[in-house]
UniProtKB/Swiss-Prot annotation:
This is Homeobox protein Hox-B9. One of its GO terms (biological process) is positive regulation of transcription by RNA polymerase II. PROSITE patterns: HOMEOBOX_1, HOMEOBOX_2. Disulfide bonds: none annotated. Pfam families: Homeodomain, Hox9_act. Its main location: nucleus. Residues 21-47, 149-182 are annotated as: Disordered. Keywords: Developmental protein, DNA-binding, Homeobox, Isopeptide bond, Nucleus, Phosphoprotein, Transcription, Transcription regulation, Ubl conjugation. Belongs to the Abd-B homeobox family. GO terms for molecular function: DNA-binding transcription factor activity; DNA-binding transcription factor activity, RNA polymerase II-specific; RNA polymerase II cis-regulatory region sequence-specific DNA binding; sequence-specific double-stranded DNA binding. The lineage of its organism: Eukaryota, Metazoa, Chordata, Craniata, Vertebrata.
Amino acid sequence: MSISGTLSSYYVDSIISHESEDAPPAKFPSGQYASSRQPGHAEHLEFPSCSFQPKAPVFGASWAPLSPHASGSLPSVYHPYIQPQGVPPAESRYLRTWLEPAPRGEAAPGQGQAAVKAEPLLGAPGELLKQGTPEYSLETSAGREAVLSNQRPGYGDNKICEGSEDKERPDQTNPSANWLHARSSRKKRCPYTKYQTLELEKEFLFNMYLTRDRRHEVARLLNLSERQVKIWFQNRRMKMKKMNKEQGKE
């Protein structure tokens, strides 16, 4: 009987153990875990708990939740950051200056006009233009008239054969321009007017050689220089000699 009782108890225990494998928490009640872990907590009670001071958040607004339509395509670790629309706190203002520069002309509502600084604008090279400051010319009317009188053509500009050059001189600093635009240094030839030529021809027929006083008087009457009258008479005598030679050969 003892053997049969032992076997029956063995079979009963094996059946009960197999059935209880599916639910292991039922085998050990929750009271055992609580009683076993309580001594562990009691061992660390002699150390004081650490107290940390709460710090201000760096950014004003918290992380916004991800939209449902975009959460499916992004991994679970990714947290998008949406720029807050509100005014940041005073502690984080210095961190946002490089992110969002404030306009130059605007100032904080608490500041006065002393904080606003008008910055000059760069115009042409070497010039500074200020905003909102009109420019006034200090030039007087007398100075303007003097400048205009200097720019007006004078009597010397209307003179005939005043020694103006053929064309404007090229750039003296550029040797290639001097070589390409090389011209003679002779002055521009100023022809005499018909009236001047007629009067000189009359004087030449009357006398081929002029005295100094007569040359001075003719130059004054015809608005010419004495040198011009002298050269004209020399050329006219050479032309007359040439015509006489041609007539003698014929």
